[in-house]
Curated annotation (Swiss-Prot):
It is found in: Virion. GO terms for biological process: virion assembly. Keywords: Viral envelope protein, Viral matrix protein, Virion. The gene is M. This is Matrix protein. It comes from Human parainfluenza 3 virus (strain Wash/47885/57).
Length: 353
């Protein structure tokens, strides 16, 4: 049997049961009705319980805009601090560093950051962060924090259109998401490799089914019913291509054997919000290994794969319920990818790079 459309192989539950779950952030308020800060840590690759650890840190919180003073009031009002009010929610990824302190010290330092925010636009809408008041606990991340940081607005802000352009905006950190990295590294497949097309090859893609503790339908993420009748979401990631000698047929059984030999283990982390981590503990074919730059651990941040889904579920519980390998014929090389709506060289349309 040859593969002409798509074939599916379902991984055993044991491949994701150990670390395929993320606990939700507890959304609690104190007596002043202010959100209580909290730190959440996911562990990938058996990191050390004590001493120095490598932590990827992702800050979550609220955008707050400066209140406008009333035109009419007393003279004393001219010197009063108008304060800030919430105008949206978002995040600030500050990356990976070696950390020796404890979790609560890191949380306290993060909540004391003074972060100014500006909304702007280049090729895409961007959010600009400028950070002050960096405490010693955050010095491992200082090389990034001390410089201005820009991110795609649709990746770090739930509703960037709500951020005003004519007022001062601050980002107040409430939650800290950490991914503690052990023996596994944070490797992401290069875009050139992920976009690779080779003739007479089979593309191995992974479809990851998840359930989450938040209602997503009202936010534009429609859930579907799985085989058990339960609501679930799914997303896809690209693993790589496999190739046989010229003239040999690709069968479902052949592809299945290749996948089973890799002995893939799946975990969920908090890199960029929610992230999928794939660890190949078995043997990998030479063709596929070269595409992975001979790495065995791959990180897929949902922030890059599906930013809107990531924005909706990054504070909730997330659990892997099923993982499928999808075997599909590789796209022909003559197929072109059009990242822009306006295509070059079509009629009277011209585009200058």
């Amino acid at each position: 049997m040859s593969i002409t459309n798509s074939a599916i192989y379902t991984f055993p539950e044991s491949s994701f049961s150990e670390n395929g779950h993320i606990e939700p952030l507890p959304l609690k308020v104190n007596e002043q009705r202010k959100a209580v800060p909290h730190i959440r840590v996911a562990k990938i690759g058996n990191p050390p319980k004590h001493g120095s650890r490598y932590l990827d840190v992702f800050l979550l919180g609220f955008f707050e805009m400066e209140r406008i003073k009333d035109k009419y009031g007393s003279v004393n009002d001219l010197d009063s601090d108008p304060g800030y009010k919430v105008c949206g929610s978002g995040s600030l990824p500050i990356g990976l560093a070696k950390y020796t302190g404890n979790d609560q010290e890191l949380l306290q330092a993060a909540t004391k950051l003074d972060i100014e925010v500006r909304r702007t636009v280049k090729a895409k809408e961007m959010i600009v962060y400028t950070v002050q008041n960096i405490k010693p606990e955050l010095y491992p991340w200082s090389s990034r924090l001390r410089k201005g940081m820009l991110f795609d607005a649709n990746k770090v802000a739930l509703a960037p259109q709500c951020l005003p352009l004519d007022r001062s905006i601050k980002f107040r950190v409430i939650f800290v998401n950490c991914t503690a990295i052990g023996s596994i590294t944070l490797f992401k497949i290069p875009k050139s490799m992920a976009s690779l097309s080779l003739p007479s090859t089979i593309s191995i893609n992974l479809q990851v089914h998840i359930k989450t503790g938040v209602q997503t339908d009202s936010k534009g993420i429609v859930q579907i019913l799985d085989e058990k009748g339960e609501k679930s979401l799914n997303f896809m990631v690209h693993l790589g291509l496999i190739k046989r000698k010229v003239g040999r047929m690709y069968s479902v059984e052949y592809c299945k054997q290749k996948i089973e030999k890799m002995r893939l283990i799946f975990s969920l982390g908090l890199v960029g919000g929610i992230s999928l981590h794939v660890n190949a503990t078995g043997s990998i074919s030479k063709t596929l290994a070269s595409q992975l730059v001979f790495k065995r651990e791959i990180c897929y941040p949902l922030m890059d794969l599906n930013p809107h889904l990531n924005l909706v579920i990054w504070a909730s519980s997330v659990e892997i319920t099923r993982v499928d390998a999808i075997f599909q014929p590789s796209l022909p090389g003559e197929f072109r990818y059009y990242p822009n709506i306006i295509a070059k060289g079509v009629g009277k349309i011209k585009q200058w790079n």
